[in-house]
Amino acid sequence: MSRRLFTSESVTEGHPDKIADRISDTVLDALLARDPRARVAVETLITTGQVHIAGEVTTTAYAPIAQLVRDTVLSIGYDSSAKGFDGASCGVSVSIGAQSPDIARGVDTAYERRGGGTAPGGPGDELDRQGAGDQGLMFGYACDETPELMPLPINLAHRLSRRLSEVRKNGTIPYLRPDGKTQVTIEYDGDKAVRLDTVVVSSQHASGIDLDSLLAPDIRRHVVEPVLAGLAEDGIKLDTAGYRLLVNPTGRFEIGGPMGDAGLTGRKIIIDTYGGMARHGGGAFSGKDPSKVDRSAAYAMRWVAKNVVAAGLASRCEVQVAYAIGKAEPVGLFVETFGTATVDVERIEQAIGEVFDLRPAAIIRDLDLLRPIYAKTAAYGHFGRELPEFTWERTDRTEQLIAAAGL
């Protein structure tokens, strides 16, 4: 088989775009905690010394947005001008309006309830009432490369970025700063990951730190080597002998965070999902309540794809769903198994339709999405972390899928 190199990247919670995502999701959580039916679309721009919040919110709740911004920035680690940003003294501006009544009309009373047809529950089904918050297409993906059923490149990149933040916070490498990035290149033999080719780690650091004598050895010893050891402990077989490690390839990374680059909500959508291994519909997640199918349907598609793989119906599965704004029922469902299906793909698609209700209200109900759980999703991937709050990572429909597929 042909041998190819595939690369995925991750960033730490201190990357400017991830600060923005975290702020947006923290505001969302604060509103959902007080009003689970809040309609929220919050965008954040962070730059040198300033944070700007904008968007649309319709709610009965109050949230102290400026204080939430400051607390979030400080919790990430930006607490001093020496680090390029200080959450205690930065400027915060807030410009929030209400959700458009034209959008609200379609979400509150779906096309099906306005005489456009009836969804599977039949007349009077309450799940027919809520329409999709926008048109669009969303993808979900799963594969058997890791125990979490995620692609190995993004899985490993996230492990490295989490470890990079961990050694900064626990003082193992005390001179690190919050901003950081990781990148992993893995060699594939056909569809099988066989060898680690290259690891890139870039981390913001205090001034006066020598790359060759201090930073690079510390990163290898305290970040990369423990993470690679963890792969073996998790039963992931990968040849890691002789891999290339590049640490801060520019030679210096003292200016980082919002001083180095402006950050925006929703600008790391490939890192948030599958590291480029699967397609993406284009919609970002952070700052959006679950009436926005950009978020809730993407979570549902991960749930669907993961259950298909866990059920043994395929070893790789990508699922696409599509919606029209204001309509409850999806307008399209597409399943791709890349030649790995154990039954006809048509049977898998039919089984998905029988087992999963993909109307927005049903997704919100089944995944219990009206909870303040979203700040935890903002860094290190929305998928592949099996936390109790991440209900879309459950493999609780495998038996139903197997039965529906006729196995």
Curated annotation (Swiss-Prot):
Ligand binding (L-methionine): 56, 99, 261, 292
GO terms (BP aspect): one-carbon metabolic process; S-adenosylmethionine biosynthetic process
Catalytic activity: L-methionine + ATP + H2O = S-adenosyl-L-methionine + phosphate + diphosphate
InterPro entries membership: ADOMET_SYNTHASE_CS (IPR022631), S-AdoMet_synt_C (IPR022630), S-AdoMet_synt_central (IPR022629), S-AdoMet_synt_N (IPR022628), S-AdoMet_synthetase (IPR002133), S-AdoMet_synthetase_sfam (IPR022636)
GO CC annotation terms, alphabetical: cytoplasm
Cofactor: Mg(2+); K(+)
Function description: Catalyzes the formation of S-adenosylmethionine (AdoMet) from methionine and ATP. The overall synthetic reaction is composed of two sequential steps, AdoMet formation and the subsequent tripolyphosphate hydrolysis which occurs prior to release of AdoMet from the enzyme.
Sequence similarity: Belongs to the AdoMet synthase family.
Protein name: S-adenosylmethionine synthase
Organism of origin: Streptomyces fradiae
UniProt gene name: metK
